Amino acid sequence: MFGGGGGLNPRKMKQMMNQMGIDLEEIDAEEVVIRTADEELVFDDAEVQLMDAQGQQTYQVVGEPESRERGDSGSEDDSETESGGEFSEDDVEIVAQRAGVSESTARETLEETGDLAAAVQKLE
């Protein structure tokens, strides 16, 4: 597809990516967790790369995940919103930074919505 030969020279590949406006960054991640309705996929010591292509960020995770069951996913979400304080300071900080609001506003919105993405979307 990219022509004959044994592959691209890494320097040439980097030059081509720069010309296309693509930045690649290694992230020193200790752990990556992907939560679904039924399970959590936990990557310990995963290789994570952030690719920024003209403002669109894509994360690539390479590693072997450990699968854990989540249990009652519906009641877990309800308890987070009712009890408050179930969100870590990192969660609150992420919402505050993404939405450009104070941490107290971010915390209140997290408690209302029960979800990071929904909180950011509501505040934007």
From Swiss-Prot:
Gene3D superfamilies: DNA helicase RuvA subunit, C-terminal domain, Nascent polypeptide-associated complex domain. Residues 74-93 have a biased composition (Acidic residues). Keywords: Protein transport, RNA-binding, Transport. Residues 53-124 are annotated as: Disordered. Contacts the emerging nascent chain on the ribosome. Homodimer. Interacts with the ribosome. Binds ribosomal RNA. Residues 7-74 form the NAC-A/B domain. InterPro entries: NAC_A/B_dom_sf, NAC_arc, Nas_poly-pep-assoc_cplx_dom. This is Nascent polypeptide-associated complex protein. Signal peptide: none annotated. Disulfide bonds: none annotated. It comes from the Archaea. The gene is nac. It holds the Pfam family NAC. Belongs to the NAC-alpha family.
